[in-house]
Each structure stands twice: as C-alpha cells, then as structure tokens.
Amino acid sequence: MVIQVYVEGGVINGNVDATTASNSEALREELNRFMQKALGREDVTIVVKKCAGYKNAVKEFINSEDIQSTYLYVDLDRVPELREDWFNSLVEDDISIPEDRKSRICFWIQEMEAWFLKQPQAIEDWASDEGYLRVAGQEAEIADHHSIAGKDIEHLQHKASDVLATILRQKFMLEPRNGKKLKLRYGKLRHAPGIIAHLSPAALIKRDSELERFCEKVKDQADDM
C-alpha cells in the first residue's frame, strides 16, 4: 500500500538556486525516511510530497483523487486546544476542506521544530556530527535549557523554531573563519534534514500524540486491506 503525505515545507523547484533546491529535497527525503521508520511496516510505502506553504499543501491534498491513500501534515501554528481555529482560518481564505478528509490531517504542534525540542539529544548528536563548536560557558545539555526544561513543548509561549534558533545560537558556533567566530544561525532547509536524521521515531511517538495518531491510522488502514 502506498500512502502519499502532503507536507508543509520545502520549496517548489523553479526559480531557486541549486543549494536551496538540494536542501529542500533533503528535507523531503528525511521526512520520508523518518515516517517510514515510525510506521515500521514493510507493507506500507510512504511518499512525502513537499508543497512549500501550508495553503498550497492543503490545496494539493484537497485536489488529490484518492482520498484513502492521502494525508496532510502541516504546522498547527497554535496550541492544540485551538485546532478548530486552523480550519476556520482556511474558510476565511475561501479554502474548504471536505468533512471526509479532515480526519486525515495531522499536525506539528505548534511547528515541526517541536519534534526537535521534544528530543533534545537528537540536536546534541546532530551538532556533534556536524562538527559545530560549543560556545564557552554553554556546556550544559540542551535538555536543561531554561526555555524547554520541564515544559510542555506544545504549549510554549514562543514559536518552536524561534526557541530552537535561540538555543543553537547560544550554544554553538562555526569553525572560526579569518579570525571571526560565527554563531550558529538556524535555517530550516539547511539544518532540519540533519536533525530529523538523528530523531528516534519510537521515542518520539511516545511524546507526540499527532505522530502516534498518524501511524495508528495508517496501520489500521493497512490491516483492513
């Protein structure tokens, strides 16, 4: 069984430079690999389709012909209790999602980067493998950073991407060039693929109800075939 997942993120190949296009494809590939591992099923093939902005992803999802083989995975951009507000915001833009498709929509709450903050060791491992240098005085583990330690990641007051960017900027820097020390500045297309590659699907499922819901729904569908 083939499952197509329309996702927010990446760029549509066209008038973009080669590096951006390559990074965008790397993001799609890593999401594809991660979701496949999360499912743990050899009888299901995941095909992630990058759609740039979330509205474009929604439109592609709505216009897909085979309802049973398609899902949508996008940022909720708000706390989970305000899920209906996301649907209402689309109606305001004259985008209506058929009722029979709403159950096939899953969310990153509040953003995809929440996955990374829920599994800070993945960030540590990625930074180490990339050879980033630790800033002096910032030896404490990312898990103990005041912005996420002991907090519900899905209810952070600031965007997960901003929190991640702050953590990376405070804790890591690049190899000095021409005598200049450059702090690590987060870029989704540049850095997210590498962090995703270090995530543990089994561990993340236990901390992310939306990812768990996606996997269980696909598994149930496969079992019924």
How should each PLM-predicted stretch be described?
Residues 2-16:
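Catalytic nucleophile-elbow at a beta strand-turn-alpha helix junction centered on a G-D-S/GDSL motif
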